[in-house]
Amino acid sequence: MNQQTASVATKTRDYHVDNIKGILIILVVCGHLLSYLQDMNSTFAIGVRTFIYFFHMPGFIFMSGYLAKGFLKKEYKGEKLLSYAWLYLLFKNGIDLVHFIFRRPYFAGNSHTIELILIVCLFCFGIWLLSQLYSRFPAFQNGFILLVVLYSVLKTNVLTVGAAPWYMMALIWYHIIVYLTKNMKQSHVLAAAVIIAAFANYQDPIGKFLTLSRMINFLPFFLLGFYMTRERFETIVNHPKWKYLLSILFILSAFVITINGRAIKKWIGVFFFGVSPYSKLLKLGDWYYHIAPLTCILWMAVTIMILFGLFALCPRGKTFLAKLGRNTIGIYVLHRFFKDFLIYGGFYGVLSQNEYIAVIETIVVSLLLAIAFGTDFWAKTMNKLSVVNVKWLYKKV
């Protein structure tokens, strides 16, 4: 019976989508690891990272929306939202813990290779042990949740969402929005989201408060994925003419954006991430300021074409990327901790002095991290930790 079930699951699984998610999560890891090289003013690293940041999160969010269609049919919607909130708290506090450890005076100055390896091993073992206790003992689960929530409220600014955990908070907003607008015409909701995203930056950004700025800027991509049917998606990426044109566009975009990465980089925050207001454009002239919403909409359109170029290039069959694509949450969360381990361990100091080779070395390490954390072991570990059981709230008295 189990073999038959597994066989059916294998046949019905969309490996093309898994491969797309696999490539996107590798790009997420690459983008984060290249950020430190960018801070070291490597021109090539800036170009490559700018190209990745041009489309990787819009693509990741598009696929999140595309795969979220079953949310409205779920009986326990609150459980889904709370699992994202819980992962957000774990993620945020986990990053704070890593910084707390390595910012101790003991780690200042000299190299501590042995200590670093020991801490990394203990950190990995601790996550596994925590997942076992959390999943097997309800009393421990409830106590741990209470402890983390209390600590988050008392010791950290839980409403200020920065760095990688913002994605978890954004998913909560997106699922709430699709639920609240489920009876509205899809084209109207999508158009409203585009208009709001295009005009929002005339005001000073809300900043990191509940990740509202980024949520607004990326909302059109989630809705586009959520509303797009599988038939329409496959028609676009598999149509011979469109597939060829979009693939060429993706390759040309990679070349143009990478070459002009330093010039493009400073405007991504204005048009995409919602971290800079349109008033920043005034130094270029009033005309640029007044047409900013149109520029933002054009930016979205170009990004969508680049995305579908990537989708068209992705393999359709079962590859190692498909496994990574199935286990994206574990990779997304765990690689962020190891980025800090690499920084504190002096990884960037041993890279080649040649900026091109240094970027290649960083990409290779990014791929290795994605493969390591994309294993079934870590997928099961993270799945156990992400569960928040609230079904008792739905029980009839």
Which role fits each region the language model picked out?
Residues 1-196, 317, 323, 327-330, ...:
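Membrane-cytosol interface segments of multi-pass membrane proteins
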Residues 24, 30, 90-94, 192-197, ...:
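Alpha-helical transmembrane segments of multi-pass integral membrane proteins
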Residues 33-38, 99, 197-211, 254-271:
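C-terminal ends of transmembrane alpha-helices
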Residues 48-56, 160, 164-168, 208-219, ...:
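Hydrophobic alpha-helical transmembrane segments of multi-pass membrane proteins
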Residues 124-130, 173-179, 222-234, 304-318:
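Alpha-helical transmembrane segments in multipass membrane proteins, preferentially the mid-helix core
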Residues 193-234:
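Loop-centered beta-sheet repeat module
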Residues 236-322, 327:
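Alpha-helical transmembrane segments and terminal signal-anchor/GPI-anchor hydrophobic tails
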Residues 256-262, 336-348:
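Hydrophobic alpha-helical transmembrane segments in multi-pass integral membrane proteins
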